[in-house]
């Protein structure tokens, strides 16, 4: 029957299991990693199917779903078990159905009853399975292959002692043996291939399957020698529609060979795999999540252009974080002294888009001759001087043309740069950042980096990407999908194609063993690498329940770990259509933080995916909205947009709380959830730890570039710098947790590039010597920004150099940035720890219809009537004057306040002009001033 409608007609159902005969050749065009052996074995041929899809869903041993189709009245269940054919006529399921067994997106499907013994079903699952349907009295037939992920969970993970309870997947070392365990319930055969350190074969061990768990296991003797290994599986794979013999690495790998061709057996607890002093390092403790400040860092960006490294060998490597006197380390020490306490590392797990063999990649410091050794046909091979570096050649080219971006784009495939959002193995450090990527060497180097960052006084955050893999199917860097095809990835309910809404092949963390892999991996990073917290890429593509379970598991080994991530609601999981997502709204109250686009867009301007003039039209409060309209903006429209953005910003400053009270621009008393953000509420958080505030990160244009797109042409250099800093101040002084992009304090530019993920050191440069902010170093790559070239050229021409900053400007910006950080960390009033404190203590002034445009005024009270959180300060007032003129702000008893001593003694002479009078404050243009009232 259909779940919502019983049907009376008799139906029969066919499930067919088959194999095909063919040789298999796979795409060999991807050069980034050494490819694993992939061949097929011969088997019995079957007739071609009339039609094929994957719209059948086998959920439990008894229940199978098919889409409703009135033409298909007869269904037959058939399977081929080694030549033995069985058939059965079935009726629609008419019993009581537990709706929780039916995923939300399948609840319109018809339900059928399957009558097969469990052992028979487990055998059937090792072959091709499909449903054949025919209309009575016709020759019309339809076939649909079967999706079985939920059935696999029921069969192998629903009991108290089955696959998801095993704690030792992968390779486990004991004194006398090495034990291996792999979950592959649909495999016909699994063999362990063992190798020595020279990759010479030493053992071929057939593994044995436990039919209760689907786990294949076996062991070899522990001879105390290095052991590398692979798994060879005989398995039906829907990508080729054949029985394949596939050789792959271990999804539970803890160590790898160079370029991840072989898994490596390792004991992470062995002292030989730890740097000196590993057990003695001091982790930085955080009392409350709101005390965190995250500083987002890319490992290569940190040192790629540092002229003060002790050796070129550490450039772009883990080892650069252990330097003593590099420019980057000196700056990190300054940041720590100011109060930043977390270094957030962009992906550092093993990725599929970086060649780990340094002899096979180039960087800008290499001579053109090396480029020509790798790519003899490259156009630069025709120039006369092959000894000059690629960097030197790029510097000879004009800036306002497409020439530089063309060169950078042409070397993307062979350079050593990528952000790393391309998971290959989840639980091994990436080898391209190691000086030696082979086996345990990369692990020791990674641990040394973590130890060095800890010793500098920071916590270490890992950016993790469990929502997709680099590849799937039979592709070179696919692992999970070779071991249990169509299980670890989320499939379209009709076509069976792997969803790619994230960018790549989406994983299905709603499936038990994918959730387990994520959780087990996180525990390893926290326990064995002393990682202090995790940022989850596209977190809303994962279930809320999976995130809560993972957090609980990690906190069992590290009590003050913190989880945060991207809670964007989109794709095939949007609006909870498959499960309750780990999205912004759903995570409210969990203290799992989500990045808030509300404050971001109010400050920067929205339309992050816009192009051309639409970018320039989209001003934000931090880029001139209403106060500095550019030539494309209608002033009436601008004022209306400002009033909404200002209310959104106020809620953002109050930790984006759903229940925070505010008088809105229409003079109505509303709460944060009643202020609109598109078709969503502005306020969604129930705790300040739910909210991550930012105005710039690795995605999209940098804050500096964003503002240059939008500011009026005649804006002075000085004002551009002040505007940039003021935008940062919104994120820093907001309740919740600040997230800061490395180099934003240096006015960092990527020369307008929207998405720099694979565009090398040229566009991603960060100069810790503060000589350049990397602005106007060439038009950004055509692939991402060609539509914006006309606007960029116009902006550069009409700004007439006012957008070009000096080392003095950069130094000023860096110092004011550090002062802002010190201000935040000087008082817990900026770091209130629950919604009740914020709602009762934080107030906004200059609101409603009569508000002065360009003024956001926030007070935070610590008066006697409240439980005191600061022994020295009884109240503070933060005034953000985004207008181009000085402002006087009426405020009762303002004379009791003084400008914060950090600003009084700081480098900004303008903010020192801020004053408090009997009943008002005075704040200069484009200035954020913090006034305090002592206890």
What are these regions (language model features)?
Residues 675-877, 883-890:
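Loop/helix patches that line or flank the sugar-binding groove of alpha-linked glycan CAZymes
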Residues 31-46, 51-53, 98-179, 202, ...:
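The feature marks proteins involved in alpha-glucan
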Residues 20-23:
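C-terminal motif of bacterial Sec signal peptides marking the signal peptidase cleavage site
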Residues 205-209, 362-365, 382, 538-684, ...:
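Active-site-proximal helices and loops of the catalytic beta/alpha 8
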Residues 226-229, 914-935:
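C-terminal beta-strand-rich structural cap/linker in extracellular carbohydrate-active enzymes
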Residues 25-27:
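Bacterial signal peptide processing site
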Residues 68-74, 183-189, 883-884, 894-896:
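Short proline/glycine-enriched turn/loop motifs at strand-loop junctions of beta-rich domains
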Residues 300-305, 309-312, 316-319, 334-341, ...:
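Substrate-binding/active-site clefts of carbohydrate-active enzymes
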